[in-house]
């Protein structure tokens, strides 16, 4: 209930012209194993935030999103996710962050293409066979730092950290204030 279709997002979100528009997903291990990663990617800076959760239960996922993105609430404007049950509490974390929430159409993962690409980068460190119940928060932070410190061609060879924190700006980037 209360899901807003991705087609209703403001045009500026599609333009990737400002920091603060996030794509959300979860990364899981093999069937039957507990634990998951919540992945959050800023569309403009490509900054990745990862949070380890013991399961994809909606309450745990909502708390993880509110906590990690709540570190910089001024840089959270919109949240776009798939229709997974783990995002059932979107109203809660959207309200906690003061952000509008949007949902991709079912079976159209390309509508959150940056997030899917970023999940592939995360999989370089945590392959599909990973049992996330054995992964530590320190492991997750290390991978997050590696990804966010990697210069990107799409960012003029600046890093996601540099663009997100405004120490350098990709051309025509507007930082959320």
Identify the residue ranges that each predicted region occupies:
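Active-site beta-loop-alpha junctions of metal-dependent nucleic acid enzymes
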Residues: 28-33, 50-74
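Coil-to-beta-strand transition motifs
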Residues: 33-35, 43-48
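Short small-residue beta-strand/loop micro-motif enriched in glycine and branched aliphatics
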Residues: 46-51, 103, 128
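RNase H-like two-metal-ion nuclease catalytic core shared by retroviral integrases
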Residues: 81-83, 88-94, 102-124, 133-145
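C-terminal domain-tail junction helix/linker
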Residues: 125-177
């Amino acid at each position: 209930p209360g899901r807003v279709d991705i087609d209703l997002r403001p045009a500026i979100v599609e333009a990737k012209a400002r920091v603060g528009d996030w794509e959300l997903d979860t990364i899981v291990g093999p069937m039957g194993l507990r634990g998951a990663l919540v992945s959050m990617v800023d569309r403009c800076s490509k900054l990745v935030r990862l949070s380890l959760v013991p399961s994809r239960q909606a309450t745990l996922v909502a708390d993880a999103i509110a906590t990690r993105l709540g570190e910089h609430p001024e840089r959270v404007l919109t949240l776009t996710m798939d229709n997974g049950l783990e995002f059932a509490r979107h109203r809660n974390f959207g309200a906690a962050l003061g952000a509008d929430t949007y949902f991709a159409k079912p079976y159209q993962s390309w509508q959150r293409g940056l997030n899917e690409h970023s999940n592939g980068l995360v999989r370089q460190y945590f392959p599909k066979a990973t049992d996330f119940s054995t992964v530590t928060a320190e492991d997750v932070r290390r991978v997050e730092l590696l990804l966010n410190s990697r210069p990107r061609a799409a960012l003029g060879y600046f890093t996601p950290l540099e663009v997100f924190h405004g120490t350098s700006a990709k051309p025509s980037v507007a930082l959320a204030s």
